[in-house]
């Protein structure tokens, strides 16, 4: 696409953004609980709108070349991402589950399921800081040093005679197979001639034979033409894959090259812009700086004289903390200055009156407290009936960005800057403000001394110490106790290397979140209306990991604006891709991977003090080298109800207390995420596990839609020449594989598609029966195991709330039906 295309995309996005911002106030109004569905619908609409804006801003920021526009786009992109995370939090609070059925909203907005995909900003990987890249290189160097030299085993060689015998036997076997095939064909030919002779079949004349051949050939040719036309039509409407991918690949390659060339231009324009920033700053300081300095001095001297004429004394010069002379001369006249001074005098009088009023207020407060107690007792008796949206940190950022676009960029046309160069006028205005602020600080220091000299010379008065403004009384901000540094004399690099050598920091596999294959839930609203809690699909799990893990860890600004989530628990049977999701989060964000699994901690940092030191070092390095992911595999062992005898020597619970204490210290801006995975959560203490993990994601067996996509995508990913044909019934495979995990499906595909089978695909297409035998040898996830996990999940805090809400709905529905029956009678 051209530069103009991305400019139009940006303009259209702001039109949509303006409409969405107009809808925001309506969501802030409290809604009674009986209107839960309408409230959820409004939040869902906003959520989908912001998802679309996030997708557009991500594309525009990735391909926009003009450096000043990119800075504004970055702020808008982070703000919209923060708002998406806030609305996700609201949806969880309203739906009482992590899976949201938005199919009805999609239909009303005329969107497709693809619009539910959470876009991951490309700058997370493309604009990784030099520190992150240096850390990854350091990890690779340490691991290379630790890798033992692979000893080449001396394979026992064959003697010349044994080798000849082996080759001869293989060649004789090959010749025997060919001879047997040849003889089989000869016998078939003889058998056919014998049957013709026995049946007495008469020979055709030359004309009759020609007619028969023509009839057969024309029928065959017409069938081939019809089949070809049908295939072309099915390929055109997207029902069949196109066998010729050359044109499509060429188009994709051209688009990729265009994107890369624009990114190269971004780097060039950014370097030019940075160079221009320095030159503009120096130019303004040299040319306009002296005039600014003299003008400010004249203004401040005039203020001294006018204040002395009005009040009979020189004013107190404001200190730097309150803004210095900037606030005084922010478009103020001497008369306004006089009014400000009178206002200060009135404030002192008000203080006396306030003391008298305080006594009256105390009496009123006592009465109000009594009223509040009565109200609280009523509220306790009555359930909460109102839904409210929590205040947003992202909306002010989005509003500021939209206002800047409207005032600066909306009315400007690209024909002024066809080469996407920076706007020098806008740059000079920004730098002029910076130079003015720096010069004002210098002028304030000089004028304070001049004011001191004036007081001594005119009023014979020494400078009065200016009282610093008192802080308003109120509750003291709760200060967290600073954690004692147990390694003050150690550098971060040495601690990092120590953790790598011990095996607590590991290199993550290069897996993207899009590699976690799955399709969305299409009948969620139908299940919800039937008062059935829909189980999440693999698509929902992927989206939740993008929201809770990737978006928060990818950007410091997004993490600061979004609701704080410190830890995630992934619960599901073996083979569902829990570890793959952890590695995908690390890949998408460039995060460090710390492995605190109980099996990995065995024998490392023994003792109570050792466990404390271990957790301290891990969290210290994780905070200093953000972003970081702390993975706890088999996390049920850390929270065991009762440690099994065979695992007592491992002492899996030894870091539990220190881990919980360190996790509570994480605050907004600390891009550290704890992710636990477990297959047997029933063995863990429920309260401790749910208190530690703030978000619990249950991963059930894949449904039919996800299995269909899994079979299709995994088969196609086995090689460039692998294509699905009509001979392979993917739908049948998806039905047969009910109960099997993605790992089972991948194992069966890899067992069938060997190198030899891949070479035979041209002559012998794949059929479903080839996979069924390999799949049958694997043990599926039995329904009893999944039901056990579901029962555990419904005992979690969110699961209990959902079950209670569903029960209340069923009771209300039964009561309504009984009333209707009575009325009919």
Swiss-Prot record:
Cross-referenced PROSITE patterns: IQ
Record-given protein name: IQ and AAA domain-containing protein 1-like
Residues reported in the UniProt entry to bind ATP: 572-579
Domain IQ: 206-235
UniProt xrefs under Pfam families: AAA, IQ
Organism, scientific name: Mus musculus
Residue spans of biased composition, Basic and acidic residues class: 344-366
Family in the record: Belongs to the AAA ATPase family.
GO MF terms, alphabetically ordered: ATP binding; ATP hydrolysis activity
Alphabetic keyword roster: ATP-binding, Nucleotide-binding
Basic residues: compositionally biased ranges: 467-482
UniProt region (Disordered), positions on chain: 344-378, 459-487
